[in-house]
């Protein structure tokens, strides 16, 4: 079930909107979390466990860093300036070690799943015999969106370490931040400070937001299904039989391919933005997507 599928737009979203609106205000965030996990499970099945593991680790690291800051505040009570400086440096080192531990675990899992097989295959080719054959993750599937929520988790832990945000004490809030369904598969990577003001409010649906959201969603569908998919027919025809065409046609196909890629990604981003808009959730980072789209596709 992709963002541009009929099931997502005409079944999943309406049911989610209805459940969200009927739920008590304080439970609406949990409703979004439940539907986010359902969406991810429909996409990846049991690979949901990676998202759950990342959520648990991120939450624990955030709490750990907060506890260290609390201990530091208590430890410096009644001390002079010089002693406070020594204690502060000591706790900064402790916090840095905790942060590095969390980052290494997350990047270790991501690197193993995404790149270990690539490196071992090339090393085996280079040396002429299998390298680390027993460690290759051939039977492991790649969780959808793991790069996005891993980097988002690292950003959250880093912000807690630097004191720019307070760590969440309720794990469902951390889980919703990392797993909110409109951005779990394609991004964008949001900072906690960009979404916190709207993600957890649980405010009721507003007519204007629903209308604007669906207009944005259908505009994204138009880009994907009418422009990108139609462009793909021409591009594939030329690229699959390039020997039958002259240079001008091949150049036109290459330009068409760039347009296809841009419209696919731009259309998907419009659907994502529109999905968030339905609930009145529109992170600051979403407003800068146009520059991001251009850079990513070109």
Task: Tell what function each PLM region has.
Residues 1-296:
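Membrane-embedded transmembrane alpha-helical bundles that form the catalytic cores
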């Amino acid at each position: 079930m992709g963002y541009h599928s009929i099931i997502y737009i005409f079944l999943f979203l309406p049911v989610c909107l209805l459940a969200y609106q009927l739920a008590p205000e304080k439970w609406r965030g949990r409703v979004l979390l439940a539907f986010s996990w359902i969406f991810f499970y429909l996409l990846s099945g049991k690979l949901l466990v990676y998202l759950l593991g990342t959520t648990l680790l991120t939450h624990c690291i955030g709490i750990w860093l907060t506890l260290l800051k609390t201990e530091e505040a208590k430890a410096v009570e009644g001390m002079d300036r010089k002693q406070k400086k020594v204690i502060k440096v000591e706790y900064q080192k402790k916090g840095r070690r905790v942060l590095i531990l969390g980052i290494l675990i997350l990047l270790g899992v991501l690197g193993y799943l995404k790149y270990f097989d690539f490196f071992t295959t090339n090393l085996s080719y280079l040396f002429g015999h299998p390298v680390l054959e027993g460690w290759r993750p051939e039977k492991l599937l790649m969780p959808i969106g793991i790069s996005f929520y891993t980097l988002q988790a690292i950003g959250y832990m880093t912000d807690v370490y630097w004191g720019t945000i307070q760590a969440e004490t309720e794990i469902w809030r951390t889980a919703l931040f990392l797993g909110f369904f409109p951005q779990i598969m394609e991004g964008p990577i949001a900072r906690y400070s960009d979404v916190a003001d709207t993600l957890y409010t649980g405010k009721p649906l507003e007519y204007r937001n629903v209308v604007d959201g669906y207009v944005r969603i259908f505009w994204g569908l138009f880009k994907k299904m009418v422009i990108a998919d139609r462009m793909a027919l021409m591009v594939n025809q030329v690229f699959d039989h390039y020997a039958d065409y002259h240079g001008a046609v091949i150049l036109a196909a290459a330009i068409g391919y760039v347009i296809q890629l841009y419209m696919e990604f731009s259309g998907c981003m419009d659907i994502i933005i529109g999905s968030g808009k339905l609930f009145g959730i529109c992170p600051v980072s979403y407003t800068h997507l146009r520059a991001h789209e251009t850079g990513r596709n070109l």
